[in-house]
Regions:
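N-terminal hydrophobic/helix-forming segments and targeting peptides
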Residues: 1-167
Length: 167
């Protein structure tokens, strides 16, 4: 297994609809003549070996992510679309329109600011936000964060040689 290639592809930013970086990493690892279409599908024809089977490798390039839909007055970005319990305390990358990346952490109302009823209620996606360290909508916009920007969890490839397990 080529662990460096696995690391490059794993660490590439690629939420659904924004797979360009992952597709470029895959294409760079393939022989000359590979092609990429407008939908970021990567094609790499290989000459069949005489008498050998031909195999088609078909895989998704995208990862689960979010799309910025709005920014609150205090610069936070509301999230939606995931199972609530998988989201808290994650670091995310938000890709700006100009291609830059802004790190943000998922945040929700701290327990010491919650009422007793709020502390007892199940976590809801409406209460989870991305905090990029700004204090206003204007500051978020100045960083390049705006509706339509994709966001995905920040990942770092890791490999456990003892178990052969890669993350």
């Amino acid at each position: 297994m080529d662990l460096k290639l696995c690391e490059t592809i794993t660490n590439a930013f690629g939420p659904s609809g924004f797979e360009n970086e992952v597709a470029a990493a895959v294409q760079a690892a393939l022989p000359a003549g590979s092609q990429r279409d407008a939908m970021q599908n990567v094609y790499a024809p290989f000459a069949p070996l005489s008498g050998k089977s031909v195999v088609l490798l078909d895989a998704h390039l995208d990862e689960v992510g979010f799309m910025v839909q709005s920014i609150t007055a205090n610069g936070l970005v509301p999230l939606g679309g995931w199972v609530e319990h998988n989201v808290p305390a994650h670091i995310f990358q938000i890709r700006t329109r100009k291609g830059g990346m802004v790190r943000a952490v998922t945040a929700s109302k701290p327990p010491h600011f919650m009422s007793a009823a709020e502390r007892q209620a199940p976590l809801s996606m409406d209460s989870i936000l991305l905090d990029a360290g700004v204090s206003s909508r204007e500051q978020a916009l100045a960083l390049g964060i705006e509706p339509g920007c994709p966001a995905a969890p920040e990942v770092a490839f890791s490999y456990n040689e003892a178990t052969g397990f890669a993350l």
